């Protein structure tokens, strides 16, 4: 049988170090120097949009799925344009003297004067302008600053030996003055809670300047002349903490730059690694247990996905605790859909590195399993299948009973997408090989749910998928299938007998009550109409034979091009869209693409 083929299990690979060691001191613990630069990340295969589960194991050095810039999903109807609104923005301390003098071009100045001119331009770009209350003010000087930033970006990209020791404090100061600021309050602080799946983000009004500042600093970090030994005097813990605070920005373009910059710093400054991980943990703890609101969780998880990929084996206790105490509780937050692909990637990376963590992870997922949120339940099923794709048979035997009890509940779900997603597990060859090896324990758990729903589920598609699962079980072990059928029949008969005994007992109690002289005084009102059970009748022998014939004739052979249902994004109404926001997000160029294009131009 095709599902009998075992998946080739490879030992987890440790990502190679691509960061050049610096003398800034190693982060203790014998951990690999994780890659300093996130590789250009291809568009991922979304979890809920993949082919029917296959047995191909994901390579352990794959990149984490990138965060989507725009989460707005359009329906087929006409787009409703939103009226302009006053744009919120960060709280900048505007410079008093905003009159800038245009300085000579760097390329036209004598070589010996370029360093001093470069410093003058960096200081000139520390002047902050008003983009909110009076966007049309100081247009001439805003253009001078924009042109200066643009020129410095080109200069540091295409020139060599320009990042001298005197440039480091000036570049870090310019970045800090422009970027480290008080973020605006929530878009709608007094009204309904901000919904990241529906509400459009507030874009930063000062982005024309901020974007160039980010681009300059990223090129500064990427420059071949950059020396972490010198930079560590200025890029310290205080700088990193201020950088992490910016991840709560609503503007996804800003978070995209921050993600790349923080990852570069993590790779180049070994002495800051433990501090960065600790501060990210604190952000997650506040998010889980206090605020349940933070805009940058997906980006932080994306960074951690690359970091986890580079952890040395065996894993340190600190890293295991991070998985159990931080990553697993992140599953219970209401806004899980915003960052779930990145979270699932991190979890699977841990299990690929150390299979002994599988049991606590699956037990934790079952603990946080959603009870009333069906789209979230589909996400859990997606992640659980990814975990089963890399699970060791010895670990599977430890968790299969609680795992399949939960799957039986999912198969019985009235929400057809939950039931459908659970039944797709039976098209995964590796999962079927695990089930085949443990059929005596799995089939008795699953059979009642499959049989009951093959007759009672309201959705016809589910019937076909159930028949397919039953057929696979029948082919796997005919005798065990017959035993489960007879056991199910016997259990139903016992249940019916117990129900009859209970009814007879109540009738006796009622008869005794009627003998009481005071019975007319306390007689209950007329009884309610009888409650009819939705359960099917006890299966007869004819039912059993009919089940076998039906399974043989109606089992659906899953086609390879059937796609899983996408994780639902709640679209409560056709909301008006802000055209400016949509165009701005579409025009944004990701930091990885930006760096790749500049390297090709060299």
Curated annotation (Swiss-Prot):
UniProt biased composition (Basic and acidic residues): 1-13
Residue window of motif SH3-binding: 523-530
Organism (species): Homo sapiens
Pfam families listed in its UniProt record: B56
Gene3D superfamilies: Leucine-rich Repeat Variant
Induction trigger: By retinoic acid; in neuroblastoma cell lines.
Effect in UniProt of substituting residue 207 to R: In HJS1; decreases binding to subunit PPP2CA; decreases binding to subunit PPP2R1A
Effect ascribed to mutating residue 201 to R: In HJS1; decreases binding to subunit PPP2CA; decreases binding to subunit PPP2R1A
Residues where Phosphoserine is found: 88-90, 573, 598
Amino acid composition bias (Low complexity), ranges on this chain: 46-55
GO function terms (MF aspect): protein phosphatase activator activity; protein phosphatase regulator activity
The protein, known as: Serine/threonine-protein phosphatase 2A 56 kDa regulatory subunit delta isoform
Gene field: PPP2R5D
Region feature (8 X 2 AA approximate tandem repeats of Q-P): 37-52
Localization of this protein: Cytoplasm; Nucleus
The keyword Phosphoprotein is annotated on this UniProt entry: yes
Tissue: Isoform Delta-2 is widely expressed. Isoform Delta-1 is highly expressed in brain.
Subunit structure: PP2A consists of a common heterodimeric core enzyme, composed of a 36 kDa catalytic subunit (subunit C) and a 65 kDa constant regulatory subunit (PR65 or subunit A), that associates with a variety of regulatory subunits. Proteins that associate with the core dimer include three families of regulatory subunits B (the R2/B/PR55/B55, R3/B''/PR72/PR130/PR59 and R5/B'/B56 families), the 48 kDa variable regulatory subunit, viral proteins, and cell signaling molecules. Interacts with the PP2A A subunit PPP2R1A. Interacts with SGO1. Interacts with ADCY8.
Keyword set, alphabetical order: Cytoplasm, Disease variant, Intellectual disability, Nucleus, Phosphoprotein, Repeat
Residues recorded with modification Phosphothreonine: 63
Similarity comment: family membership: Belongs to the phosphatase 2A regulatory subunit B56 family.
Phenotype for residue 200 to K: In HJS1; decreases binding to subunit PPP2CA; decreases binding to subunit PPP2R1A
């Amino acid at each position: 049988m095709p599902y009998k083929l075992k998946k080739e299990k490879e030992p987890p690979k440790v990502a190679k170090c691509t960061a050049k060691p610096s003398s800034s001191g190693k982060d203790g613990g014998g951990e690999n120097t994780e890659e300093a630069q996130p590789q250009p990340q291809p568009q991922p295969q979304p979890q809920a949009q993949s082919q029917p589960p296959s047995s191909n194991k994901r390579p352990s050095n794959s990149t984490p799925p990138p965060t989507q810039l725009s989460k707005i999903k359009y329906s087929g109807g006409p787009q409703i344009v939103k009226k302009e609104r006053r744009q919120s923005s960060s709280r900048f301390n505007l410079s008093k003297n905003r009159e800038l003098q245009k300085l000579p071009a760097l390329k036209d100045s004598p070589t010996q004067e370029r360093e001093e001119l470069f410093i003058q331009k960096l200081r000139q770009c520390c002047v902050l302008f008003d983009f909110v209350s009076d966007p049309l003010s100081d247009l001439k000087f805003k253009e001078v600053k924009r042109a200066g930033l643009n020129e410095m970006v080109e200069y540091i990209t295409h020139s060599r030996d320009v990042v001298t020791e005197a440039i480091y404090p000036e570049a870090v100061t310019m970045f800090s003055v422009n970027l480290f600021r008080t973020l605006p309050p929530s878009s709608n602080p007094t009204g309904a809670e901000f919904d990241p799946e529906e509400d459009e983000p507030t874009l930063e009004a000062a982005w024309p300047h901020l974007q160039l500042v980010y681009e300059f600093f990223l090129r500064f970090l990427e420059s071949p002349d950059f020396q972490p030994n010198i930079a560590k005097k200025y890029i310290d813990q205080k700088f990193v903490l201020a950088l992490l605070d910016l991840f709560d920005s609503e503007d996804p373009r800003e978070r995209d730059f921050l993600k790349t910059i923080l990852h570069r710093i993590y790779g180049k400054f070994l002495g800051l690694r433990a501090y960065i991980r600790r501060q990210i943990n604190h952000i997650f703890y506040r998010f889980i247990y206090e605020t349940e609101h933070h805009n940058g969780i997906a980006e932080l998880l994306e960074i951690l996905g690359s970091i986890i990929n580079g952890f040395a084996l065996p894993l340190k206790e600190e890293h295991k605790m991070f998985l159990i105490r931080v990553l697993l509780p992140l599953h219970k937050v209401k806004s899980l859909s915003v960052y779930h692909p990145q979270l699932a990637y991190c979890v699977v990376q841990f299990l690929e590195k150390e299979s002994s963590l599988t049991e606590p992870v699956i037990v934790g997922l079952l603990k946080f399993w959603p009870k009333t949120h069906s789209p979230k339940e589909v996400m859990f099923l997606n992640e659980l299948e990814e975990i089963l794709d890399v699970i060791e048979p010895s670990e599977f035997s430890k968790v299969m009973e609680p795992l399949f009890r939960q799957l039986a509940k999912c198969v019985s779900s009235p929400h057809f997408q939950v039931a459908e997603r659970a039944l797709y597990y039976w098209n995964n060859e590796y999962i079927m090989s695990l089930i085949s090896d443990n059929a005596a324990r799995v089939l008795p758990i699953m059979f009642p749910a499959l049989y009951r729903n093959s007759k009672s589920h309201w959705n016809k598609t589910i019937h076909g998928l159930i028949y397919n699962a039953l057929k696979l079980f029948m082919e796997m072990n005919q005798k065990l299938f017959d035993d489960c059928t007879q056991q199910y029949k016997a259990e139903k008969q016992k249940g019916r007998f117990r129900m009859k005994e209970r009814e007879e007992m109540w009738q006796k109690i009622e008869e005794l009550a009627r003998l009481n002289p005071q019975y007319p005084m306390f007689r209950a009102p007329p009884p309610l109409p009888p409650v009819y059970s939705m359960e099917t009748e006890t299966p007869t022998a004819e039912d059993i034979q009919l089940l076998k014939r039906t399974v043989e004739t109606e089992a659906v052979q899953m086609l390879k091009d059937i796609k899983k249902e996408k994780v639902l994004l709640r679209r409560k109404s056709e909301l008006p869209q802000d055209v400016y926001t949509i165009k701005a997000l579409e025009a944004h160029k990701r930091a990885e693409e930006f760096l790749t294009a500049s390297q090709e131009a060299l």
